[in-house]
Design a protein with these regions (language model features):
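Short N-terminal edge-element motif at the start of the domain
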Residues: 1-24, 61-64
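Acidic, divalent-cation-chelating loop motifs in proteins
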Residues: 15-31, 75-81
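Acidic, small-residue rich beta-repeat scaffolds with periodic aromatic anchors
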Residues: 35-176
Length: 176
């Protein structure tokens, strides 16, 4: 995917780019990317459905276009229904990241969002949270092998586990 044309010069407080995407929740669509300030990137995704353009999902962060982690959004059919979900990685101001998954809900004509449920994904790691004095949690998606790494930062060190990203480790689906 090539980036679209940027609107705004190098010193602009905000830059905007519009990029066509072949697969947004199984539909053609586009990504509206804005760089806010000097480092914060926000990407909103829209799918061209039977109802017209519909909001599909979002990713935001400080380290997009990172060679190791990618651009923050990946289409992949996680549910096995033949339609791709949109997997996104958002990085927050404290440096911690979270993985969100968006899917198309045909009955409601819109997207739904879910995220990794730590209790489902790794009950042992989730149980360590309280006794170890957790200072932060992070999730990193690895598109090359469709895995997610859960990292628990504690007062006594870092604990992490990597497992396949499947619908079995996701929480409830909610409408944006």
């Amino acid at each position: 995917m090539d980036r679209g044309t940027w609107i705004g010069n190098g010193n602009a407080a905000e830059k905007v780019s519009l990029t066509a995407r072949d697969d947004v929740l199984g539909f053609p669509g586009f990504e509206l990317e804005t760089i806010q300030g000097t480092v914060m990137t926000v990407c909103d995704f829209y799918a061209l459905t039977e109802q017209g353009f519909v909001y599909a999902g979002r990713t935001a962060g400080y380290d997009f276009d990172d060679a190791a982690e990618g651009d923050g959004a990946w289409p992949l059919d996680l549910t096995g229904d033949g339609r791709s979900e949109l997997i996104t990685r958002s990085t927050f101001g404290d440096g911690m990241s979270c993985v969100f998954v968006y899917r198309w809900n045909a009955a409601e004509g819109g997207s739904q969002r879910s995220e990794v449920d730590w209790d489902k994904a790794d009950a042992q790691l989730a149980r360590l949270s309280a006794p170890l004095g957790v200072t932060a949690r992070a999730e990193t998606y690895h598109a090359q092998d469709n895995t997610v790494t859960l990292t628990l930062y504690t007062e006594s060190g870092t604990k992490e586990t990597t497992l396949p990203l499947t619908t079995d480790v996701l929480g409830e689906w909610s409408t944006e």
